[in-house]
């Protein structure tokens, strides 16, 4: 919270410019986060211990699909949402899947469990990044008009770093990485989490909300994203009883507010930004209460935090 507040006030007080925050965000996405992913996976991942690694990208698709289906259901009930169906569905589908879960995990779990959860999250992000830059672009910009997106966007730096790390581990090449390379990579990767929280706070400060508009679609979108989706996964996890850390991963991802990337995609695709920006801003504020609520319910019924 403190780091997020620092990012927010650095931007609001113009200590850091909008261009400076953009550069910092690009460094986090393009350098520090990929290095953290590569470092953690090559140091701690092996295919025997994580034999079910391929499930995690599919879990990302599952979380997206549940949000999409809930969104379609609400649109079918309230036809006034049809005019903003794309942004509404984007809000329902895509969550802040990396910037918030990583620091939350680091603060909630013991060090050994944190390492495993980081790997789970990185594998989850493999599916998430490919989904948001393909299906996410389609949903936001292709309703009733021609659209296009560059498939190269699906293979961004975090995705490439994850795939490269898996290849290195698979062929046993980690032993050929000298310490004078692995140590700096690890040190720079550790910068990803605190910087990512500052970026989230800064991005919230950049969202310009002069007046609250699109109140009904925003509220309905946040009801889907922050209440219906986590409630559905709470029931799912309690019934299916997956491994404890897998259950926590699903609950964390299901509880997250709308992804800040939606605003970037909407701007690039010239889609409606107003609804998305408001949902991101107020969704992050509301999640201060909804995340502890659902994680508390999960811990109470599953006994995870006992």
Feature map (PLM): residue ranges:
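Alpha-helical transmembrane segments of multi-pass small-molecule/ion transporters
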Residues: 1-306
